Amino acid sequence: NAMLRMQQQVERLVDNRKKREAKGAVSSQAGTLGRVSLVTANKPRQMLQLINQPGEAPGSHAAPATHNQEDAVRMALQDAALGDAARAPQSATRKALTRRESLAALERLYHLVLQLEQLRREPSTPESTAAQKQLTEALWKELRVLEPLGVSDPHPFVSLLNHVKGKKLIPRVFRLLSAEQALAMLTMLIASFESLDAVKEFAQWEKYRVLDPMRHVRPPISAHQATDLGRSIDAFSNSVLFQMMALINTLSLRIISGMLALLMERNHVLACARTRPGISLLSALLSRAEALRQAANAPPAADELEQWYSVLGVLFNRLSSDGQLPSLFYSTRAASYMPFGVDMFSLGTVPGHAPDSNAEDEPVWNFMALLAIHANLSQQQVLVQELREKILSNILAAKEAKASSLPMPPGAEDVRIRNVNLLLHALNLDAAQITL
């Protein structure tokens, strides 16, 4: 499971970061969750005392906006040398591929892939090598990756991926392409991310899942449409996104900075982050950057790190502006979908009804931990301040569930605590230190 491996990688990154910190250093988040010092023999761990200051507005410790944000993004795009995807998109010059045209192109692609796979299984000869080269060129042309951005809406390559057949073909195609072609495909996927149906239609599918179990509430789409969308989102996550994450784990920090800058330049990054695929992509980029930053054998150059932090500052400001960080959580969005007077949490406890909000929120807590690892002190203060209510409500719900007399599966009451600790451990805090 890709997301499970991502969570384990984040936990390793957090542990490695803690080991590097000097002993006796003080870690605190004053004015939000309280103050905590590292434990010593003479100064044992103290329980955090939460002080709710009524006059303090959320986000009052917000970090200042990154200076020259557009310049930081533009420089990252130039240094990464991402080709045509980094240029301004042209206006649409032709109609998008129809469903019939897309399916016909996919049939040709499948035929080319089968031929190439057969040639690779046979002993290599000069004739087979020449045939492979010719077929690979035809495959690359048929994919239409290099067609200019904005040539149609959606892009021809995106039109192919808006079919489940197209998504399932991507892993086989990646194995047949050169490293440069694979990078170009990744660049196009990131540049066109929000136009992919698995991202563009995600909110409608999510809203259907929340509202469908309820009587007298009409979901935004039909059951048939929801089934098709769910199949498409699963295919994208298991095929396309899996290959994207695998390729991201081979890139340098300069390219990672460029990819993140490209995602923000060509897409509404906050809208993307409110989707499961968007959170997975952002987590993969931040996880790779932190792994490179911690690399002992070949650490990134100082200018690469400076550029990374500049681009990351732009991302943080766009995600945290106007107190929008909580909206990245499924549980927050699900509450906004509910009609007035309906208790979504009690609905979610009924088997077979709305999705488990704790399981849906887990990848977001994972991303918040990565964000905290990269953030400076002022950004960490904003992060904790904006998520304060989310943190406390999870801890309170976990304690109430533990004290309840209702039978629960073993360890079920710890899911919320585990989610919260993904973030708190990155800040050298722990849910056990918080008293309510």
Segments (PLM) and residue ranges:
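Compositionally biased, intrinsically disordered low-complexity regions enriched for acidic
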Residues: N1-A2
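Charge-patterned, phosphorylation-rich low-complexity C-terminal interaction regions
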Residues: M6-L436
